[in-house]
């Protein structure tokens, strides 16, 4: 049980930002990552569709890889599916919204926080509710940025056009008094440098990856599930879409070749 992998799922490549942080904080753990790049983005999809897709990814990992913990490294899927999946499976399941909210609360000085995310994440008010539950005196600015996920998935995030698309997407927040900005989509940290340049050094840019990895570590430790094996960890990367495109983005993000990327098909009927 201890050597069973942690499953990390996302609509595409964005959850790699969370997986990378889990690998850094928990270097002995085996990680299996599934990016549903064929059906990305989840942001504009109907909620029932997002729920079904998230369950398909979850069931695939439970049945084929016997994961000991699941990380829903997608804000849209967290907002829509986390509660349902937590109630239904027999392993620990964490999302990325609560950790992101906690991280922002720690660093804001003026209690004015911005949140950017997909249409579904923003529409759900999940971040605003999480933030106000922690501090009801906060002022929260929400902004949907639907252009950013397709841009990251295209693999062009190292291009100079990143600054232009960030400016186009974030300009409504530019003249606000926010001192902290939550990247409410796990794709967005890949554009963190461009976002920081546009918003200015006075704005704290919050990615949920670090806090999510810390929560994973805490839960595994509490439940006695930390991997103690001296054997080097085995990390697997799976995608439902174009394997070469996924591998290129993963290699760029990790700064080295991640190894073999497997293309999978999710044809099994939903099981809940």
UniProtKB/Swiss-Prot annotation:
GO MF annotation, one: glutamate racemase activity
GO biological process: cell wall organization; peptidoglycan biosynthetic process; regulation of cell shape
Metabolic or biological pathway: Cell wall biogenesis; peptidoglycan biosynthesis
UniProt-listed InterPro entries: Asp/Glu/hydantoin_racemase, Asp/Glu_race, Asp/Glu_racemase_AS_1, Asp/Glu_racemase_AS_2, Glu_race
UniProt KW Isomerase keyword: yes
Chain sites annotated for binding substrate: 10-11, 42-43, 75-76, 186-187
Active site: 74 (proton donor/acceptor), 185 (proton donor/acceptor)
Coiled-coil positions: none
Enzyme Commission designation: 5.1.1.3
Lineage: superkingdom: Bacteria
Family matches, as Gene3D superfamilies: 3.40.50.1860
Keywords, in A-Z order: Cell shape, Cell wall biogenesis/degradation, Isomerase, Peptidoglycan synthesis
Catalytic reaction equation(s): L-glutamate = D-glutamate
Family: Belongs to the aspartate/glutamate racemases family.
PANTHER family with a match to the protein in the record: GLUTAMATE RACEMASE
HAMAP family in alphabetical order: Glu_racemase
Main function: Provides the (R)-glutamate required for cell wall biosynthesis.
Official protein name in the record: Glutamate racemase 1
Organism (species): Bacillus subtilis (strain 168)
